[in-house]
Amino acid sequence: ILDIGFGDGDSIIKARKRQNQKIYGIESYEIGVNKVITYINKLKMKDIYVYKGDVVEIIDIFPDKFFDCVNIFFPDPWPKRRHHKRRFISKYFLSRLKDKVKKTNEVHITSDHINFIFDTKRIVNEYLKKNLHFSNHRSDRPITKYEKKALSKRHIIFDIIFNL
């Protein structure tokens, strides 16, 4: 499992408790990385690997066809138009990610930010050359701190699940 932008580590920690798989997390913020490392050391957990940095720069360290699935739960939506260039989901990134995911395995993107998720859906549709729809099930994804916050504000949670 590749968890991109795991924040304070909720999704990694909960996924590891439910599944007996290796989990690789990439996060650009040091606080989240440190929290997960502390948790790993405290419980002497194996099979969780964390990387601090930009996923666009780090993704190439992994061999092709390495990940069973990719989770991108509540990434920073960079809501201001002038910051949209900071969003990492692009056709270019999807093409690089495609090489790293085993065939027929899924990418799961979740957000409560409507402009971000519709823009992401458009990019994915253009890249895959098909019309994806929002998923009406949340599968077994963990409820993170960010989702709890969104739900407390009565935001709608959007899930896009697709195969690269």
Feature annotation, model-predicted:
Residues 77-78, 112-117:
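Short "lid" loop at the C-terminus of a central beta-strand within the Rossmann-like core
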Residues 1-56:
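SAM cofactor-binding core of SAM-dependent methyltransferases
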Residues 13-16, 94, 98, 121:
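A structural alpha-helix within SAM-dependent methyltransferase catalytic domains
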Residues 68-87:
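A short SAM/SAH-binding and catalytic strip from SAM-dependent methyltransferases
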Residues 89-103:
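A short glycine-rich, Lys/Arg-flanked "PGG" loop and its adjoining helix->strand segment in the class I
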Residues 61-69:
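A short acidic, Gly/Pro-enriched loop at the edge of an enzyme's catalytic core
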Residues 104-111:
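Conserved beta-strand signature within the Rossmann-like core of class I S-adenosyl-L-methionine
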Residues 116, 120-122, 127-164:
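Class I S-adenosyl-L-methionine
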